[in-house]
Amino acid sequence: MATKRICVARIGAPHGVRGALKLWPFTEDPLAVLDYGPLTTQDGSRRFEVETAREAKDHLVATLKGVASRDDAVRLNGIELYIDRDQLPETDEGEYYHADLIGLAAVTAAGEPLGKVAAIHNFGAGDIIEIAPPSGPTLLLPFTNAVVPTVDLEGGRVVIEMPGEIEGDTPNHPEA
């Protein structure tokens, strides 16, 4: 089986005229991209070594080995940078990498299929799990122990306890 590749950053626009560029990390610690060694494109055909990086607002300003001019940096804009999954540290109990969850089957506690995990989002108020059913609109649910009581990575599934308001229950407040 091929090693799973994880996208850890995306190269952005140039920063200045000496080859520095914006780097958008997808890691919990933005500077962790320095710890993974050479980063590659998804197919592994191109390698990039981050020489320096500093935090700037919501991204990093980085220099890559061999990128010496603004023109060099412009040509890299939009490239996603990957590492092998086994380079990531082990997670604690009850913690998961988004990449390990995406693609898992989503089922009810009774085993009825709901779809597949399409994404994990965080818009500032906690993690949201996005479930893509075979047809119809996607479901966006809070990624909490109450709604997602079971994550079975080896079994390839998550169990979803649908909140009442999602199932179409009537509100518990009287009409005015």
UniProtKB/Swiss-Prot annotation:
Its main location: cytoplasm. GO terms for cellular component: cytoplasm; ribosome. Keywords: Chaperone, Cytoplasm, Ribosome biogenesis, rRNA processing. The keyword rRNA processing applies. Transmembrane segments: none annotated. Gene3D superfamilies: PRC-barrel domain, RimM. It is found in: Cytoplasm. Residues 93-166 form the PRC barrel domain. GO terms for biological process: ribosomal small subunit biogenesis; rRNA processing. GO terms for molecular function: ribosome binding. InterPro entries: PRC_barrel-like_sf (IPR011033), PRC_RimM (IPR056792), RimM (IPR011961), RimM_N (IPR002676), RimM_N_sf (IPR036976), Transl_B-barrel_sf (IPR009000). Pfam families: PRC_RimM, RimM. It comes from the Bacteria. The keyword Nucleus does not apply. The PRC barrel domain binds ribosomal protein uS19. An accessory protein needed during the final step in the assembly of 30S ribosomal subunit, possibly for assembly of the head region. Essential for efficient processing of 16S rRNA. May be needed both before and after RbfA during the maturation of 16S rRNA. It has affinity for free ribosomal 30S subunits but not for 70S ribosomes. Belongs to the RimM family. Binds ribosomal protein uS19. This is Ribosome maturation factor RimM. It comes from Rhodopseudomonas palustris (strain BisA53).
